[in-house]
Structure formats: C-alpha cells, structure tokens
C-alpha cells in the first residue's frame, strides 16, 4: 500500500508541482512518502496479499536440506566491517516494522547503511552477502539494476546525487543464526529484496526489480 500510494500520488501530481524547482519538488515528494509510510504502518500487518486478499498458507516451516550457513557467515562478515554507528543504523529486531519500510521511488527516506557511505572493504562485504544469498543470475541482475541507476543519472544531466549505483541501503533484522529467525533487506531505486531465513529455509518476499533504462551500451 505504501508503494501504491506513492505511485498514484506521482501519477496524479498536480501541474503546479511540475513547475516548482527540483529541490522543492523533491522535498514535497519526500514528505508525501513519509506520510504514506506512516499511514501504511498504522495499519496492522496481515500477510502477503494479492489484489487486496491475504494469501494463506503460502510458506510452511520445513527443512529444505540446503544449508544457509554461507548466508549467515556473510552477514556476520558484513557486520564485522561496520563501525558501531553503522551497526546501530543497520540492525533491527527480527519482528521490526523495518521489514515493511521500503519503496521503489528514489526520493524515499531509507533506513540502514548505504553503499555510498561504505568504504571498499564494507562494500565488498555487502556484495558478499548478496552473492551468498542469491543465485548467480540474481546477483548479476541486482548489480545490473544498480549500475543502470547510474545510467539514469547520466540521462538526467549527470544528476548523480539522485541516481547512481551506490544509492542502495542494507538492513539486517535479527541476529544471523543457524536456528533462530533473521533476515536482511536491500532497498533502493528499482531494487528491493526482503530475505528471511529460518534454519535452512529462505523466503524472499516481497521483491521488486525494475530498471530505467532497461539496456545501456557500455
């Protein structure tokens, strides 16, 4: 609902906003996204829905036989590279509403530690978490989306403060564990992955992937 509200509000944007300076529009967009988030979080979480209907019994707790230990180790390795301030920004309880805080639009006020504020070692560890968690195809798709976001910046008069490959944020919910529930989220323009882990079982939902443009020549 948060995402839908933002999409509808941007589609129905009044003409007087279009004429406003970019900085004023972005500030107004951010305020709209904050209000939409507050309204959405005020509603009780009901589960995964399709067309407004809760989909029951989607995922049963069962062993898959596929170890998630590489994912746990990669998450711990990332946390080890972060300083105390960064850890405080990126760590949340496993049942925190942070799971519901994501949006496609670039102007959304995000949580966690951004790739743009990481040093090279931290960034490598963050990509290491993605590599351990996703298939080779999924990792490539994620990196391609991030790189195409920089292309979008180039197409918008080099507006890299708004669009670039490092404007993506990672949060971790719960403590990376072999037995207890935990997970992570990456959130940014055209790339949102919610990754929940319980033992050797993984649930990735919701996920949003997109791109603008879709193809760019190097």
Which residues does each PLM region occupy?
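Positively charged n-region of N-terminal signal peptides that target proteins for export
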Residues: 1-2
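Bacterial N-terminal signal peptides
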Residues: 5-15
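Acidic/His-rich structured neighborhood in mature extracellular/periplasmic domains
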Residues: 21-57, 64-65, 96-218
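Mature N-terminal segment immediately following signal peptide/propeptide cleavage
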Residues: 63-101
